[in-house]
């Protein structure tokens, strides 16, 4: 706080809590600022500016409390400015900060996978792909779909979906569909909590349990 000359420690604390509560969710400074101003009824000179929130987020990432994961257009080959995702460097600290509430296992598992990829020296992005579909009126539209992680290590690239469970065919199709839209043949993996033995589906996508994934360094 002293080193960065933080003037509003209350806002820094609120930003910290919001990031802890939204790991794995798309986040941008504008939405956070609007949320804080609305909840705390801040107006005029007392209102929180977007740039202030951005600065505080940067400070938290510089302190290695959070890591920013940017969104990447897989086929357009470019990064989006916002929104991005933020993951806790230490899940234990995150849980302690929010009093061990909000134990959404889907987001926690996603955070653990992200941290593991970083530990394995991968550069990690969130993948964005597009599919051509029709709206309710039968008119064509572009739909953005997300791949949880693109892990890059030199010339190696790996697409990864984090899925706590795939209880039915509909959910399985939902998780697999973005893989078919990448336009390339790099390996694709779904890391799951509900299986123990690894197997490949008909599209060549590896389904692997979270424990198996964390213990096998050869995957990446």
Regions found by a protein language model. Give the residues of each.
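Conserved helicase/translocase motor-coupling segment
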Residues: 1-62, 68
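A cross-kingdom feature that marks ATP-driven nucleic-acid transaction machinery
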Residues: 52-220
């Amino acid at each position: 706080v002293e080193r960065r000359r933080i003037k509003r420690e209350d806002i820094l604390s609120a930003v910290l809590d919001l990031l802890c509560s939204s790991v794995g969710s798309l986040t941008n400074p504008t939405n956070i600022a609007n949320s804080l101003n609305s909840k705390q009824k801040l107006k005029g000179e007392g209102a929180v500016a977007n740039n202030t929130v951005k600065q505080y987020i940067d400070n938290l990432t510089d302190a290695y409390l959070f890591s920013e994961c940017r969104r990447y257009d897989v086929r357009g080959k470019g990064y989006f400015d916002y929104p991005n995702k933020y993951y806790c460097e230490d899940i234990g600290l995150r849980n302690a900060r929010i009093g061990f509430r909000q134990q959404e296992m889907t987001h926690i598992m996603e955070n653990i996978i992200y941290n593991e990829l970083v530990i394995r020296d991968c550069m990690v992005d969130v993948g964005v792909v597009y599919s051509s579909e029709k709206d309710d009126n039968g008119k064509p539209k572009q739909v953005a779909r997300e791949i949880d992680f693109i892990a890059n290590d030199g010339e190696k690239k790996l697409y990864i979906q984090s899925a706590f469970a795939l209880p039915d065919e509909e959910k399985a199709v939902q998780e697999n569909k973005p893989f078919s839209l990448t336009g390339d043949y790099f390996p694709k993996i779904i890391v799951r909590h509900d299986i123990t033995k690894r197997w490949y589906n008909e599209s060549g996508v590896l389904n692997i349990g979270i424990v198996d994934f964390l213990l096998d360094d050869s995957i990446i």
